[in-house]
């Protein structure tokens, strides 16, 4: 077990400030995910309306490769979650 050092008012204030920045990042990420879902749903509707398949495996591979290259293994998992959100489970 590791001992924790007592924090100081200065450290507490900085931590609160940094957490505020994280909260702002989270809000931006959530907004972007909503935007991505709307775009993905429109693509799916257009593909189905024109007789296409619901999804494109080649495109999904591109997305996963991009997330993996940028963020590693966890990035691929994040990419898969976003794809699933947009198209539903297979």
Kindly give the residue locations of the regions a language model identified.
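Domain-level signature for soluble enzymes in the chorismate/prephenate branch of the shikimate pathway
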Residues: 1-90
């Amino acid at each position: 077990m590791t001992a924790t050092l007592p924090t100081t008012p200065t450290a507490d204030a900085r931590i609160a400030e940094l957490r505020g920045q994280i909260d702002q990042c989270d809000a931006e990420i959530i907004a972007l995910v909503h935007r991505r879902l709307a775009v993905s749903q429109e693509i799916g509707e257009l593909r189905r309306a024109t007789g296409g398949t619901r999804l494109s495996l080649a495109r999904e591979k591109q997305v996963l490769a991009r997330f993996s290259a940028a963020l590693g293994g966890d990035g691929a998992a994040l990419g898969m979650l976003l794809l699933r959100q947009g198209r539903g489970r297979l």
